[in-house]
Design a protein with these regions (language model features):
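Positively charged n-region of N-terminal signal peptides that target proteins for export
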Residues: 1-4
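Bacterial N-terminal signal peptides
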Residues: 7-17
Length: 332
């Protein structure tokens, strides 16, 4: 009898778990560049794949290839009962604002922008803090006293990366020149590796020996240009050190993988909450990468200095200005 009861309980637990999995229908709308952009979108995908492998729960997905699809795909996911729905990137904000109002019972999360609605969770990062750290690395590594920055689309968010980077560089050596260029003013700026390579080469030819790219797929061109010209680059969002081993000084890590994973996990266990989440150094939401692909480029002194700066920023001893607080950077 006890064995029968145990078997029934196990069967009931299995059926309950199965029904819960069936009822839980997470989804994601990737931004332009797609889930294999080796940068921002791919970081999101890595986090969601971790969730899928751990739980066995599949998720629906769409990729934006043109502006009109944002609203269309978000609405399609919500109308099919997907919940929670992740909108990837700041470009989804306008469409999400509209669609989230149409589906007030659906939980939405947007990564990299704020949408202030009762059924939306907004996750943003202190990119300026992580960029400060790689700026410190660049200044310590540079032999030419000149470094560069290539941004993607010319928007305040990317100036936030640039400003943090310049502050980090100047913190070590105020005399270092920082060349800065944005790729363009339309979403196409995120996926133009040839232009990224061209901008980086111009900086290398002008004397820069390290260029930081915060430009999505365009940044791959910067990394390639560094390798082609025997210079160094700095990657962004995901760990890009392996893409050009020995030529990527480091990558400014933006832990969108962790953020995406937590959206699905909290959605499943009931702890998901609307509102705002801001992830910086203290929350381990940003950082820098050190692995077998760049370990020979980073000296012990550099590691010690960056670690001390990281602690000082968290403690409030070093203040890193957020460009988006006033659309200005105190240093150039």
């Amino acid at each position: 009898m006890k064995r029968m009861l145990s078997a029934l309980l196990l069967a009931g637990l299995f059926l309950w778990s199965a029904s819960q999995a069936l009822a839980f229908k997470p989804a994601v709308l990737f931004d332009m560049g797609g889930k294999f952009d080796k940068s921002f979108n791919e970081g999101i995908w890595n986090g969601l794949e971790k969730f899928r492998k751990e739980t066995g729960i599949k998720y629906r997905e769409f990729e934006v290839t043109q502006e009109a699809q944002r609203e269309q795909f978000l609405r399609k996911l919500a109308s099919r009962g997907s919940d929670p729905v992740i909108a990837v990137g700041f470009g989804q904000a306008a469409a999400l604002t509209k669609v989230a109002k149409e589906f007030p019972k659906t939980r939405f999360s947007i990564i990299d922008m704020v949408v202030d609605l009762p059924n939306v969770q907004s996750i943003i990062f202190k990119e300026h803090e992580g960029s400060f750290l790689v700026g410190v690395l660049a200044a310590m590594k540079s032999d030419s006293a000149a470094v560069g920055f290539v941004g993607g689309m010319d928007i305040p968010l990317i100036h936030k990366f640039a400003c943090g980077y310049v502050q980090g560089v100047k913190h070590i050596n105020p005399g270092v020149v920082v060349y800065q260029k944005m790729t363009g003013t339309t979403p196409a700026a995120w996926n133009d590796p040839a232009r990224g390579a061209q901008l980086a080469k111009t900086m290398y030819d002008s004397g820069a020996d390290i260029v930081y790219a915060a430009a999505g797929g365009t940044g791959l061109g910067v990394l390639q240009a560094a390798a082609d010209n025997n210079k160094l680059s700095i990657g962004v969002d995901s760990n890009q050190n392996h893409l050009q081993p020995g030529f990527v000084l480091s990558s400014m890590l933006k832990r969108v993988d962790v953020a995406a994973y937590e959206v699905f996990k909290s959605g499943q266990d009931g702890s998901w909450k609307a509102g705002f989440k801001i992830l910086g150094l203290a929350e381990e939401g940003v950082g820098w990468s050190l692995d077998e692909h760049n370990s020979k480029l980073v000296t012990s002194a550099m590691k010690r200095k960056v670690e001390q700066v990281r602690k000082d920023i968290i403690a409030g001893n070093i203040k890193v200005h957020d460009y988006m607080s006033n659309n200005k950077c105190p240093v150039q």
